[in-house]
Amino acid sequence: MTLKNLTDDVLIERLKKLVHEEREILMSVLHHLREVERRRLFSKYQCASLFAYAVTELKYSESQADRRISAMRLL
């Protein structure tokens, strides 16, 4: 079934559920990043910083890495 075939109500409900799941996953990612930084695990991967690790190993763009690390530091 494609999105085009969904009723408006079903589409909206699925979207809300996905956004909720996305928030939960993002919070888990941020907590994991914080623990990686606390343990300085990025150095095991020849990265000088969490930012370098996020870009090279996690394949985030520089702006994605910066946003996530900034959010992580607010926890």
Describe these PLM feature segments.
Residues 47-75:
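Amphipathic alpha-helical "recognition" segments
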Residues 1-58:
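N-terminal acidic-hydrophobic amphipathic loop/helix motif that frequently occurs adjacent to catalytic
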